[in-house]
Regions:
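Short alpha-helical segments enriched in small residues
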Residues: 1-203
Length: 203
């Protein structure tokens, strides 16, 4: 991934919530990451998503931090704040308790970048135990995983992860990086649609 970004002359910024810096740690563990990695914002507290990343406060009040539109705005926000070509984001519930009315294992990951969703395919994070489900809803639907998100340059994936807290966080890291890799590799992704996928964490 670092090589792909470097070859394209592009940069990356990361916004994290439930992963708490794990995505940034994974990226910076790769030699040469400094050529492409702009930095990260760990917006663990809900108000930081609003104050630092520019996520709409009314949206956060109405639907909470665990929401596909929040993930989209986090990815777009960190891309702008840190001046990167690409922004990626994670938000969700690692457990042990539900949050904002969402069950443990509910996770949304997002990628924002030029041409991030120009095709009509669907993103299915790879896992030996994955059971991809067709995205539900359509343009204009709101409030549930699977609704189409605004903006032609953002992909959001809704995950239903099984496992303990650590497994859910690890799988969230793997899934957002896979989504970015798919975009960089020119593979088909969800055309701005939140794709709902259930899988076991830790695979």
């Amino acid at each position: 991934m670092v090589r792909l970004l470097a070859a394209r002359g592009e940069t990356l910024a990361v916004a994290e919530s439930l992963t708490g810096g794990l995505v940034a740690a994974e990226l910076t563990g790769v030699p040469g990451a400094s050529r492409v990695f702009r930095g990260s914002v760990t917006a663990y507290a809900t108000e930081l998503k609003r104050d630092v990343l520019g996520v709409d406060g009314t949206l956060l009040d109405r639907r909470g931090a665990v929401d596909p539109e929040v993930a989209r705005q986090m990815a777009e926000g960190v891309r702008g704040v840190l001046g990167a070509d690409w922004g990626i984001a994670t938000t969700g519930v690692a457990g042990p308790d539900p949050q904002d009315g969402q069950a443990v294992g509910t996770v949304f990951v997002a990628v924002a970048g030029q041409g991030a969703a120009e095709d009509g395919g669907q993103t299915r994070p790879e896992s030996a135990a994955a059971r991809p489900d067709q995205a539900v809803g359509g343009p204009g639907n709101t409030g549930a995983p699977g609704y189409a998100l605004g903006g032609p340059d953002v992909n959001v994936v809704a995950l239903r992860l099984n496992g303990d807290r650590a497994e859910i966080r690890r799988e969230s890291v793997r899934s957002v990086l896979k989504l970015l890799l798919q975009r960089l590799s020119g593979e088909r992704a969800g055309n701005g649609r939140a794709q709902d996928t259930e899988q076991n964490g830790g695979n």
